Amino acid sequence: MIIVSRAIVLHNTAYNDSYSIAHLFSRESGRVSYLIPRSSKRGKSGGSLRLLISPLNELEITAEHKQHRDLHFIKEAKLCSLHGRIQSDPVRNSIALFLAEFLYLILRLPEADTNLYDFVAFSIDKLEEMDGPMANFHLAFLFRLLVPLGLIPDLQFGGSVIPRWFDPADGRFVPNAPAHGRGIPPHQSTYLQLFSRITFDNMKAFRLSRAERRQVLDYLVDYYRFHLPPFPLLKTPDILSTLFD
């Protein structure tokens, strides 16, 4: 079956001497894996295709999908838009690598989700186009991503004015520390309501130290880890921590 779709590059790994495997998030088919020629000798389009397979590149692809196969072939591909600033700016590029790694871990199903796809594509365009401080971009992305994923926590205190523990497993405030030992303590959980309002447009108003930003990121990732297992350790947060004061 021939499909035509927009698709976002998540990850590319070596497969054998002839091919690598590119993992793409397709608007029409969800996550799909493709064999990418490692040498232009395997076809006149192999070399150009290989150059397009870069994290968070959005492509328009024509691909051949065969039933009962996990690996497919891309017949034609072109960039939907040029993200020159993401490629050339170290800060944007580091954020892009984090987003790509994160999405690679959580987007696993070969099922179309157009709302989710459109949000991710919109976010990539924002990363390319925005000016000014970018230190909170990844936090705004993770908070806003909860909506299309259907993982929005209940951030109401339930009538209580006393700060309470937040249980990431249940996604709600609780009176006591959760038994699993990974709850967010009261003196920090109150910030969740504040940060739940963060967007790409207002993120510059959220002033955080490097340590505070990393703490918020760790709490967010842990929330995802509870709700989308299995969730291995991320490699890119340490890179982000070195960039922003």
UniProtKB/Swiss-Prot annotation:
GO terms for biological process: DNA recombination; double-strand break repair. Coiled coil: none annotated. The keyword DNA damage applies. One of its GO terms (cellular component) is bacterial nucleoid. The keyword Transcription regulation does not apply. It holds the Pfam family RecO_C. Keywords: DNA damage, DNA recombination, DNA repair. Belongs to the RecO family. Involved in DNA repair and RecF pathway recombination. HAMAP family: RecO (MF_00201). This is DNA repair protein RecO. It comes from Porphyromonas gingivalis (strain ATCC BAA-308 / W83).
